[in-house]
Curated annotation (Swiss-Prot):
Its EC number is 2.1.1.176. It is an enzyme of class 2 (transferase). GO terms for biological process: regulation of DNA-templated transcription; rRNA base methylation. Its main location: cytoplasm. One of its GO terms (cellular component) is cytosol. This is Ribosomal RNA small subunit methyltransferase B. It is found in: Cytoplasm.
């Protein structure tokens, strides 16, 4: 191993420990911390390592906490948060990533010294060697879930909740969506095979490719040209749920990061799409996505709160509305494991109130006979079937349309897919028709 390689290895472990400290002890978002950290790491392999370590540690944190309580003579004080995170970085390398033990131990111990804690290097080495010998204590699949959320999911779904916890503890696959005007799934799978990337088409999702192992988008042929996008299978089904005329006027009310809007425009190039997002910075992501995939599409982008129609709506009704509402994200814990660290019980009441405002406001913009598709990546009945039922009760000109079993299990007036089903994320769909 060269000196440069060794230095990069230490820097990667340090970077992962610092990201994790920000997530665990400062309440920061994993996505935001990685976005701030990874661009400063030159080698894409090191960037991938930091990301993989962080996800692995957050998923396995309950077991690692138990191990540290058993193996440390005394608990580490709060000032040693980075040191504790570094120990977990070592654990993840050994258990989840299964890196060669000598490399994992050496780089992590050296990272301890680089952290300015040379006196703790012996302790770190001893703890990691014990982990290597003994493995980690078994913990229940729901161990990382807040008690209020465990209770709520069991109340909503009964025995099915255990399968939710088990599936949510797994790593999510990488799904791609091909642009049919450029290629097709079978052809793209063959292109990937030429690069030794194993992938599969899907019998239910006509535009989908699922990778056996995730890869950086820079390794995906045609990504920059718009041949393919990264999008979970559940999100891809949004385009299947809406029936659209060739030149329909469509509102995407909460559009960021833009994948669903792009898919609709790929399917229906003549759409007149208005894409909103309350966050101007996130709307820039939408613009970048659409520029890469459908640069000639008819799209109006507006940084606006969809619930405040006076601020953005010109009074012309829409033929269809997609309301992918802000939610608890409990269906995507596989992809966002830090949701379980940051989500609070009182968040749900605020989210439900926001969802109701968005439903009422966007419904007013829909023409008679038009369709509104309400979706979330939540598993909670309050945000999903109960939210839709309350809307139907207060909205005389709304009725639910039936979606097929390919969208998941019947849940009130909608459909619920659970994490891991069809290899997809947890997702809720409800299709609502406005009376003519």
């Amino acid at each position: 191993m060269s000196a440069d390689t060794a230095t990069a290895g230490v820097a990667s472990r340090l970077a992962a420990a610092r990201v994790l400290t920000a997530v665990f002890d400062q309440g920061r978002s994993l996505k935001a911390e990685l976005a701030a950290t990874l661009p400063g790491i030159g080698d894409p392999r090191d960037r991938a390592l930091v990301e993989a370590i962080c996800f692995a540690v957050i998923r396995r944190r309950p077991a690692y906490e138990v191990a540290l309580r058993q193996w440390l003579e005394r608990a580490l004080p709060p000032r040693d948060a980075e040191l504790k995170a570094l120990l977990m970085v070592g654990f993840a390398q050994l258990e989840v990533l299964q890196l060669p033990a000598h490399a994992a131990l050496s780089a992590t111990v050296d990272a301890c010294r680089a952290l300015g804690r040379p006196r703790q290097a012996g302790m770190v080495n001893a703890i990691l060697r014990r982990a290597q010998r003994e493995g980690f204590p078994a913990v229940a699949d729901d161990a990382g879930w807040p008690s209020w959320l465990r209770k709520q999911l069991r109340a909503d779904w009964g025995d099915r909740a255990e399968a939710i916890f088990t599936a949510s503890a797994q790593m999510a696959p990488m799904w791609l969506r091909v642009q049919r005007s450029r290629t097709d799934p079978a052809t793209y799978v063959a292109r990937l095979a030429e690069l030794d990337i194993v992938a599969h088409t899907d019998a239910v999702l006509p535009d989908a490719v699922r990778l056996h192992n995730a890869v950086p988008v820079s390794q995906l042929p045609g990504f920059a040209e718009g041949d393919v996008s990264v999008q979970d299978g559940s999100a891809q089904q949004v385009a299947d749920a809406l029936t659209l005329a060739p030149s329909a006027r469509v509102l995407d009310a909460c559009a960021a990061p833009g994948g669903k809007a792009a898919h609709l425009l790929e399917r229906h190039p003549g759409l007149q799409l208005v894409a909103l997002d309350v966050d101007a910075r996130r709307l820039e992501r939408v613009q970048q996505t659409l520029q890469r995939t459908v640069p000639n599409a008819l799209v109006a982008l507006q940084a606006a709160d969809a619930a405040d129609t006076d601020a953005w709506w010109d009074g012309r009704p829409f033929d269809a509305v997609l309301l992918d509402a802000p939610c608890s994200a409990t269906g995507v814990v596989r992809r966002q494991p830090d949701v379980l660290l940051h989500r609070r019980a009182d968040d749900i009441e605020a989210l439900c109130a926001l969802q109701a405002r968005l439903l009422d406001a966007t419904w007013r913009t829909l023409r008679p006979g038009g369709q509104l598709l309400y979706t979330t990546c939540s598993l909670l009945a309050r945000e999903n079937q109960a939210q839709v039922e309350a809307f139907l009760q207060r909205t005389p000109d709304a009725r639910a349309q039936t979606l097929g079993a390919q969208f998941g299990h019947a849940a009130g007036a909608g459909r619920q897919r659970f994490p891991g089903e069809q290899h997809c994320d947890g997702f809720f769909y409800a299709l609502l028709l406005k009376a003519s």
